[in-house]
């Protein structure tokens, strides 16, 4: 019988200690508490789920911002999240919160925490085969670490007032991000930045490819600075062979302090829009947009539809809607929805596929699947 744990207060994993969570375990966080529940990882965390028996972090009322998140410390050496569901996180900490007491993520109380945060420049993490959904702020936020983010689903992140990215990256990271589905991120699927760079925090190196980005950006009602991918503060990612589908904007950067264009690789990618508004907002003359002739883009509404196997867009889709539960808003996602391609555009997508990076860090996933992790 699978085990379940009910948390009414935060759990703190000490420096040097490791917590292993076995397949099928469900951790339910109580929502009606004075100090939001958090999982603070000062040591190591290994969530070792399987496809049949994922590890689940949820809440008792199943509402966004019911609990904090998984917040890792500056000495956290290794974290593995394999076949893990993380939902309803993003609560605002208090001065009594474990993350705040350990000076992690928030040094002032001015908003919620992400569902998963990693910050050790020398640490390692793996996120694989996991499902992050209905989290009130960013799904993930990285200010350091060497990580692999592969084969995950990130759905329904953020809130209209404060935004919320699926994958938010600052300086200090070396990341390999591939084969993820990002659906309905409030602001961007990816926010890629070198904010925080210093003598001890190096510039980030990011390789982002073969990801599917669907319906992102439409809920952001304030500071509309993104809608699929935002690159700033001299970030220099490799961002290629990604599919961006019906998101509010295409690739963007600020007027000042934008991407390091000389050292980035930001094309080819595939952009589809089912509406004329979508076509206009990712066009060559779109404000703050980054344009490449080598990308594949819809030039009229509905052109180059990738034809997903079991996902069908709402006929009333309005990528500037900004409000949930009205005509034109994005439909909810089911974990079993297939975003694999079923139709004739697969050949066009393969035209983008000119990138096969080495992935030495993926060996960590293979070691875990073989029962050898950690080494």
Predicted regions and their residues:
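Extracellular beta-rich repeat passengers
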Residues: 1-22, 27-375
């Amino acid at each position: 019988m699978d085990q379940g744990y009910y948390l009414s207060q935060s759990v703190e994993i000490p420096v040097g200690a490791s917590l292993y969570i076995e397949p099928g375990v469900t951790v339910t966080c109580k929502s009606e508490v004075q100090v939001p529940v958090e999982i603070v990882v000062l040591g190591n965390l290994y969530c070792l789920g399987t496809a049949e028996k994922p590890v689940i972090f949820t809440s008792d009322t199943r509402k966004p911002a019911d609990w904090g998140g998984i917040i890792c410390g500056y000495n956290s050496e290794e974290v593995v999240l394999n076949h893990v569901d993380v939902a309803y996180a993003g609560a605002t900490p208090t001065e009594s919160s474990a993350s705040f007491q350990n000076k992690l993520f928030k040094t002032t109380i001015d908003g919620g925490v992400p569902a998963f945060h990693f910050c050790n420049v020398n640490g390692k993490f793996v996120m694989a085969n996991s499902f992050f959904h209905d989290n009130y702020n960013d799904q993930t936020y990285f200010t350091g670490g060497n990580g692999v983010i592969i084969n995950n689903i990130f759905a329904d992140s953020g809130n209209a007032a404060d935004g919320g990215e699926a994958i938010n990256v600052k300086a200090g990271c070396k990341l390999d991000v591939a084969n993820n589905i990002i659906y309905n991120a409030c602001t961007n699927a990816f926010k890629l930045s070198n904010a925080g760079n210093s003598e001890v925090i190096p510039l980030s190196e990011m390789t982002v490819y073969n990801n599917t980005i669907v319906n992102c950006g439409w809920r952001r009602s304030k500071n509309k600075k993104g809608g699929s991918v935002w690159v700033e503060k001299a970030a220099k990612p490799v961002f290629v062979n990604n599919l961006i589908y019906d998101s509010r904007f295409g690739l963007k950067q600020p007027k000042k302090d934008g991407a390091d264009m000389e050292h980035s690789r930001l094309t080819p990618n595939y952009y589809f829009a089912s509406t004329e508004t979508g076509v206009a907002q990712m066009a060559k003359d779109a404000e703050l947009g980054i344009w490449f002739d080598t990308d594949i883009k819809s030039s009229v509404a509905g052109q180059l539809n990738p034809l997903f196997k079991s996902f069908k867009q709402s006929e009333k889709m309005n990528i500037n809607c900004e409000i949930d539960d009205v005509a034109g808003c994005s439909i909810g996602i089911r974990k079993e929805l297939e975003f694999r391609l079923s139709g004739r555009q697969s050949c066009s997508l393969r035209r983008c596929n000119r990138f096969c990076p080495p992935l030495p860090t993926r060996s960590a996933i293979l070691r875990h699947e073989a029962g050898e992790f950690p080494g």
